[in-house]
Amino acid sequence: DCRGRHNRDLKNYDKLIDPLNTVILSKKYESDVNLIYTRCVATPNGWTFVIPNQDSVSYGYLYNKNITSKEDAISDFTTRFDLDYITETLEFDNYVAKNFRVGERTILQGNMYGFLEPLEATSVGLYQRLCRCAWDGIFKVHSFERCNRNIRNKMMELQNIVMWHYQYGSKFDTPFWDYAKSLHFKPDQKFYEVANGNLDEEYGQWEQWNFQNWKNGVEYV
């Protein structure tokens, strides 16, 4: 079932912890030859992605509508990134299904299974892993119960990594960043084992060396 986020049976979902719920989109219809990677730029109200395309650059201003008004968000977005117009505004939830299997014949996939804001661009990797879990369940490599537990654990690891970013705040001292830093952050023991170099296993979609690079950048304690 890949019908997206709008047709969900809400009783089968849990909310994920995340400070964002809205994105404003824009685009510049000219390429930037000097931009060869996706930028993630902190703003007073959240952060913005800047994605280079072949003939354009896409922008997405992520913020919390309960903290920042749409008018203030648009004003900061267009001024900060020198944009002429807005293409779309989307509101979203961060969530995960309690069970990726519904009935005897249906596997939830894509946004029907779960969604986490794009700070670490984890969706494709998660959905590929979900295909693996579905295969393992259908062909009895593992029980569906074990497969469901594995994929939910993976989603929680992704949430923990994203929330780790927010714990360190940004250069902005604003209501949004105060709120983001105040959110519950208590990752599992595996997180600390990998982060401290005691366990050489993948966590979420990251290896031990990814953790080391992150720690070096933020003076991890």
Q: What does each of the following model-derived ranges do?
A:
Residues D1-L83, C131:
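Predominantly flavin-linked oxidoreductase catalytic cores and closely associated redox partners
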Residues D136-V221:
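Long, low-complexity C-terminal extensions of enzymes
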Residues N7, N12, N21, N34, ...:
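Detector for Asparagine
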Residues Y13, Y29, Y37, Y59-Y63, ...:
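Sequence-level detector for tyrosine residue identity
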